[in-house]
Amino acid sequence: MKKNAVHFGAGNIGRGFIGKLLADADIAVTFADVNEPLVDQLSHQQEYKVKVVGSECKMETVSHVTAVNSASEALIERIIKTDLVTTAVGPTVLDIIAKTIAKGLSARFAAGNTQPLNIIACENMVRGTTHLKQQVYQFLTTEEQQQADALVGFVDSAVDRIVPPLQAANDDPLEVTVESFSEWIVDEQQFKGEIPQIEGMEKTDNLMAFVERKLFTLNTGHCVTAYLGCLKGHRTIREAIEDPCIHAQVKQAMQESGEVLIRRYGFDRALHSAYIEKILSRFANPYLVDEVDRVGRQPLRKLSANDRLIKPLLGTIEYGLPNGMLLKGIAAALKYRNSSDPQAVELQQSIEKEGVRSTLARYTGLAAESVEAQQIEALYQQMD
């Protein structure tokens, strides 16, 4: 019997990454999205193309998929019967879909479905599914919460695949381009019932090590590349990382954050060094056109205490490790200007009004009088 999955978010990551892995594992996927034209087209065509780009390009077709509107009763009907729910909607939208998931669970319990259900949020956030669970439970009665405790697994995951926006020249709106590299790691301790066998979904009992490995390496390296690239006038991540000066600085920033991971989780230094090299080569992928503005956007979120710049910095402080290039990356983030990004505008207004160190204290939690804030301010002032 074919398994079913409901996947929230029919955007590039939904189609190009999670939806594709599910469909490749012979699971019937229903995408749920608010974008009506996209939903109509997916439910009409029931397939789409994915261009997978690594050392070469190959085109693959994902089939046996359909789509429903996130606000529809049809979605609730699907949740009543489904075996798996996944999301790729972005951290802010997670809170919005929680109510819909709760409604689906209520209907599922009312219909007497006692089969276990697993829910996996595939978002760029630490323990995103645990956060989603807290939001969902706000809309369930005490009795429903008890049923959910028994029957519903909220499974945290770490995901990694670069999926840039499609080039506008393409006339197929469903086609998506993804890199050949992908990593989807799930916390095997949180499943209810049997764990689905999905090629490309790895299980671990130490998820936090992998969440931080990705955050401190891929995400840290990506945004440092973007912010240093912006300062030198590069347009894309590839252009920036092929600048030898930026390449060396990004590599050093990832090595600094890597020392925190090695200390904290006991990662093997040689293997971690190879992981860093792999990421540098991914940034230079000639088939991925990823603009520095896309990777640099929402700087306030990226400068928050639990995110890709400050969290590794705090680790270097905790263990007394060198952090000069992480500090430089943070200074470059403070220089990020983009008039169409409200967070970038707010950041620049704050620096203008309150100065660098007060801005750091407000958005990152670093004390304004700390050595690190003073070093960041000095680096900021040296930048053009």
Curated annotation (Swiss-Prot):
One of its GO terms (cellular component) is cytosol. It catalyses: D-mannitol 1-phosphate + NAD(+) = beta-D-fructose 6-phosphate + NADH + H(+). GO terms for molecular function: mannitol-1-phosphate 5-dehydrogenase activity. It comes from Vibrio cholerae serotype O1 (strain ATCC 39315 / El Tor Inaba N16961). It is an enzyme of class 1 (oxidoreductase). InterPro entries: 6-PGluconate_DH-like_C_sf (IPR008927), 6PGD_dom2 (IPR013328), Mannitol_1_phos_5_DH (IPR023028), Mannitol_DH (IPR000669), Mannitol_DH_C (IPR013118), Mannitol_DH_CS (IPR023027), Mannitol_DH_N (IPR013131), NAD(P)-bd_dom_sf (IPR036291). Its EC number is 1.1.1.17. Belongs to the mannitol dehydrogenase family. This is Mannitol-1-phosphate 5-dehydrogenase. GO terms for biological process: mannitol catabolic process. SUPFAM superfamilies: 6-phosphogluconate dehydrogenase C-terminal domain-like (SSF48179), NAD(P)-binding Rossmann-fold domains (SSF51735). The keyword Iron-sulfur does not apply. Keywords: NAD, Oxidoreductase. It comes from the Bacteria. NAD(+) binds at A5, V6, H7, F8, G9, A10, G11, N12, I13, G14, R15, G16.
